[in-house]
Amino acid sequence: MIEDFHLTPLSANADAADLLEALGPLDDSPAESQYCVFRSGRERFCLPVLDVEEVLDWPLLTKVPLAPPYLLGIFNLRGVIVPLIDIALTEGRRPGLLPKHVVVASLRGEAGHDDLRVGIAADEVIGTYSVTTEDLLEQAPENVPHCIGMLRHEDRLALLIDLRKLLEVYPGPSI
């Protein structure tokens, strides 16, 4: 509300220390980050929302000959070819059961390089959530090399995906 807004006039020769003093004490509450939480197979995973480009319904896929089993195919996303991987394959997804959604994630390219996009098969997109750093656990199971931690969410844990590691573990086709 406008009543909550308070201006403190500063003199013309005020410096940075005067400005900080006028602002008052800084908020010491834990920093919050937003994550997209989704289920793939039996496990919940999450990505920072800044890494998620969009969530799609299941697209029309083109199979890639001689592709590894985790590479479900490629699809066209507004003129960009995106590989679609199934990270639940290692957990024994039931044969013939296709996921319903695709979480399209983007790994920002370094200077002079394009962004890398990858689609991750998701059975359910649970939502986006703001969490504090207290809700993040630094340890991930050692047998999940593409995860760098875990997020506490609704009394359950979601594995935090590192896109760089994910693309090392599940390399897509060279296009």
Predicted features by range, described:
Residues 1-175:
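An acidic, low-aromatic, low-complexity terminal/linker signal
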